[in-house]
């Protein structure tokens, strides 16, 4: 059998630091972020189905979210101000991300590629699935910014304001539900959230 480097590459997610241009009270790596996004994306899909006439597959969305930033194994975590500096850079970076996704998928044994492609190849995601994963990504970034600010790190003030604006753009009923029901618990002491 031929050796595959796929999971060794995924293991590198824990080495990629997010928010790399900002001082962090608590560092966050891409593996941690991806798991949190998967939790939130799954919840958003369940909430949409339960309360807002959705027809999403929460399990599929959770796995998509687990893999949503895996292209950064090859590209690194490009800071947002650079990624969205102008439309040409944004488009070029999207092409790089697509090439990185294809390369990662090609690291799998050929017999497994078709089974993983629906979660790794963003061209196979529906607009609604992408929307839910993006919402989860924004919520998790917002939670991080809020944590940093609550712990005295003013470096995240502009990031939180930018995220609040983006969250309004990506808003949905399920996102509002999640924010109202779950976000207030973040930052509370362990004794308050476990009793």
Swiss-Prot record:
CC terms in the record's Gene Ontology section: cytoplasm
Signal peptide bounds: none
Protein name (database record): 5'-deoxynucleotidase PM0747
Site note Appears to be important in orienting the phosphate for catalysis, residues: 18
SMART domains referenced in this protein's UniProt entry, alphabetically: HDc
Family: Belongs to the 5DNU family.
Subcellular location: Cytoplasm
Nucleotide-binding among keywords: yes
Binding sites annotated in the UniProt record for a divalent metal cation: 33, 68-69, 137
Principal location: cytoplasm
């Amino acid at each position: 059998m031929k050796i595959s480097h796929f999971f060794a590459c995924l293991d590198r997610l824990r080495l990629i630091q997010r928010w790399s241009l900002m001082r962090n009270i608590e560092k966050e790596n891409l593996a941690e972020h991806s798991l949190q996004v998967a939790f939130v994306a799954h919840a958003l899909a369940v909430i949409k189905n339960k309360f807002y006439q959705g027809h999403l597959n929460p399990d599929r969305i959770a796995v998509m979210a687990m893999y949503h930033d895996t292209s950064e194994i090859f590209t690194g975590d490009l800071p947002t101000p650079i990624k969205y500096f102008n439309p040409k850079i944004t488009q070029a970076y999207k092409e790089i991300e697509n090439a990185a996704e294809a390369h990662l998928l090609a690291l799998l044994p050929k017999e497994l590629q078709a089974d993983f492609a629906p979660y790794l190849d963003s061209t196979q995601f529906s607009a609604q699935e992408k929307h839910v994963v993006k919402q989860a990504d924004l919520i998790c970034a917002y939670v991080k910014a809020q944590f940093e600010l609550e712990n005295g790190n003013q470096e995240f003030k502009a990031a939180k304001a930018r995220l609040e604006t983006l969250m309004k753009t990506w808003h949905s009923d399920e996102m509002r539900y999640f924010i109202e029901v779950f976000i207030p618990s973040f930052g509370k002491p362990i004794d308050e959230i476990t009793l």
